[in-house]
Amino acid sequence: MNCLVSGRVQGVAFRAAARRHALALGVTGRARNLPDGRVEVLACGEAEQVEKLRDWLWNGPPLAHVTDVVCAPVEVPEITGFEIE
């Protein structure tokens, strides 16, 4: 699943928190800042765990203020770990 997270999500440790949460759920993927101020999160794993991560994205870490999360299913090769780009 690929998600685009909007709001105050850069400069608030959003990517690092997403990585910690994803790894705790057993989800692999990546998180990266986009030039337009959003954060892109690519998540791979068991559907239930990926959905839990998606739900978490709506809150994010304490300093974040999420205004929108748009997710879409994507086909991705096998990913190990969770990277921050």
Regions found by a protein language model. Give the residues of each.
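Intrinsically disordered, low-complexity, mixed-charge
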Residues: 1-85
